[in-house]
């Protein structure tokens, strides 16, 4: 895999608060190699390590997207949800940003059935068939559509398991991470000082609570994915 330059700037990361970890009492000792200092009861993340692993992750997603691979971005907590949706839409990736439904990947046949149901209902709505139903029946179908849009809207075009999963908060999305590990799906994980860096294929040490930090990391990854897709289009 060729190493590329991704314009990862330490000053830019500091401005986004990427270096702020959790309180010193709330940490995972396995994160010790990624912590550079303590300040006012907070662990400070070593941004040199962040830059290194973010660059590796960008190389990985560029290489994968240049070969037509599919990505899933997962981040369901409020601070991450909007950034996840925006990043995924920009890079034409699948995403989950509301709630991870247990078995979404490991029980793919059930998820696929739900997606088929969702597509059928959307087609009926587009064709105007809901208007012909009795009001009560139409209301039931609309509630179903709303529920499916909330939880499956980001993966409505997914036809199989993703090739790489990007996870914004390891602890918050632990179920999703375990499913990826079970299925052998490579993962890129944004990890704060309370996480286990050994669980993901590439762990990026960074503040997973600040919107600016999350957005910066996703922006770099999305740029690499888009660059890879452009390469794939030019050289299919």
Curated annotation (Swiss-Prot):
Organism whose genome encodes this protein: Spinacia oleracea (Spinach)
Family: Belongs to the universal ribosomal protein uS2 family.
Compartmental location: Plastid, Chloroplast
Function recorded in the entry: Component of the chloroplast ribosome (chloro-ribosome), a dedicated translation machinery responsible for the synthesis of chloroplast genome-encoded proteins, including proteins of the transcription and translation machinery and components of the photosynthetic apparatus.
HAMAP family: Ribosomal_uS2_B
Protein's UniProt name: Small ribosomal subunit protein uS2c
MF terms (GO), sorted A to Z: structural constituent of ribosome
Keyword Ribosomal protein: yes
GO terms under biological process: translation
Subunit structure: Component of the chloroplast small ribosomal subunit (SSU). Mature 70S chloroplast ribosomes of higher plants consist of a small (30S) and a large (50S) subunit. The 30S small subunit contains 1 molecule of ribosomal RNA (16S rRNA) and 24 different proteins. The 50S large subunit contains 3 rRNA molecules (23S, 5S and 4.5S rRNA) and 33 different proteins.
Superkingdom classification of source: Eukaryota
Entry keyword RNA-binding: no
């Amino acid at each position: 895999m060729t190493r590329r330059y991704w314009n990862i700037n330490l000053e830019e990361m500091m401005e986004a608060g990427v270096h702020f970890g959790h309180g010193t009492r709330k940490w995972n000792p396995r994160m010790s190699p990624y912590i550079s200092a303590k300040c006012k009861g907070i662990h400070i993340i070593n941004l040199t390590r962040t830059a290194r692993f973010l660059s590796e992750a960008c190389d990985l997603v560029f290489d994968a997207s240049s070969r037509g691979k599919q990505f899933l971005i997962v981040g369901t907590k409020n601070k991450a949800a909007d950034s996840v949706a925006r990043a995924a839409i920009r890079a034409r990736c699948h995403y989950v940003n509301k709630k991870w439904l247990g078995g979404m990947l490991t029980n793919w046949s059930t998820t696929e059935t739900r997606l088929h149901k969702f597509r059928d209902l959307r087609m009926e709505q587009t064709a105007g068939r809901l208007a012909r139903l009795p009001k009560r029946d139409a209301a039931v179908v609309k509630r179903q559509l709303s529920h499916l849009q909330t939880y499956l809207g980001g993966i409505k075009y997914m036809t199989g398991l993703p090739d790489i999963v990007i996870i914004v908060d390891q602890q918050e999305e632990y179920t999703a991470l375990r499913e990826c590990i079970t299925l052998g799906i490579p993962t890129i994980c944004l990890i704060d000082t309370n996480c286990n860096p050994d669980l993901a294929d590439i762990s990026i040490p960074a503040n997973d609570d600040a919107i600016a930090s999350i957005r910066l990391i996703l922006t770099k990854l999305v740029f690499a994915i888009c660059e890879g897709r452009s390469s794939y289009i030019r050289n299919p």
